[in-house]
A protein has these predicted regions:
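Short, conserved "active-site rim" segments that organize catalytic pockets and cofactor/ligand binding
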Residues: 4-28
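Glycine-rich phosphate- or other oxyanion-binding loops that anchor nucleotides, phosphorylated ligands
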Residues: 3-7, 31-237
Length: 237
């Protein structure tokens, strides 16, 4: 069982957590535990205890993983790292977005009077981020010279790769980027009163060019984001 000072770090794919796992192995001993088909790797980054896990793609996988981190490992905060598509013309491939909050852009019960994105029964449409953890990521980005943006992250079980879908999400939520896990992680953290932060490196423009850009820049963006997380976590000690 980890302590409340431990940070859970979630990536959806191997490429998003590979550098983190390598760094942990270089820092010292690691311990791996399997739950629900996921491998939870306990170790340290710098002097901070962490649990790193690949959750798999999508909202259900992300939510399941987050709840396991909180319930079984007792983490005190959760940091989601990975890649995303840009929804803002000023945010380029290779830039980083540190979330201010996160929304589920697929949720739509508007026919029953709810705002688009609002889950019936939920006390908020957008799930807030922990400012201390988010600022640590921003500060690390400034120190290593990464172009960083703050703003809303939109999540849903859909790879956004068309101008029409991009415009729909931007118009409804004024989000900076889109991906497939962050809002689910933030939702679980919100319900559990667990601090949360999301950082995403841009791999594509979430438009008609995404099918070309994403395979080209996926690994580069994921590595870039993981480096930033290592710097941020190391600064917390």
């Amino acid at each position: 069982m980890a302590s409340q000072s431990t940070i859970g770090i979630i990536g959806a794919m191997d490429v998003e957590v590979a550098l983190l796992k390598k760094h942990m192995q270089e820092c010292g001993e690691v311990h791996t535990t399997a739950f629900s088909g996921m491998e939870f790797i306990e170790g340290v980054i710098g002097q901070t205890s962490v649990v790193v896990v690949k959750c798999g793609v999508g909202m259900v996988n992300a939510a399941t993983c987050t709840q396991i981190l909180i319930d079984r490992f007792g983490v005190g905060a959760v940091l989601n790292t990975g890649i995303a598509g840009s929804l803002d013309a000023t945010i380029e491939i290779g830039d980083v977005v540190v979330a201010t909050d996160a929304v589920n852009h697929i949720m739509d019960v508007s026919n029953l009077g709810y705002a688009v994105g609002q889950t019936p029964g939920a006390d908020t449409l957008a799930f807030p981020m922990n400012e201390k953890l988010s600022c640590a990521v921003v500060d690390a980005a400034v120190k290593i010279g990464v172009t960083t943006h703050r703003g809303r992250v939109a999540s849903g079980d859909r790879f956004v790769c068309s101008d029409s879908e991009k415009q729909r999400i931007t118009k409804a939520f004024d989000a900076k980027c889109c991906e497939m896990e962050g809002a689910a992680i933030a939702n679980v953290c919100h319900l559990s009163n667990t601090p949360c932060a999301i950082v995403r490196a841009i791999s594509d423009k979430a438009d008609g060019s995404s099918s070309v850009d994403y395979p080209t820049f996926e690994a580069q963006a994921a590595h870039h984001c993981a480096e930033l997380v290592i710097h941020a976590i190391s600064s917390l000690a």
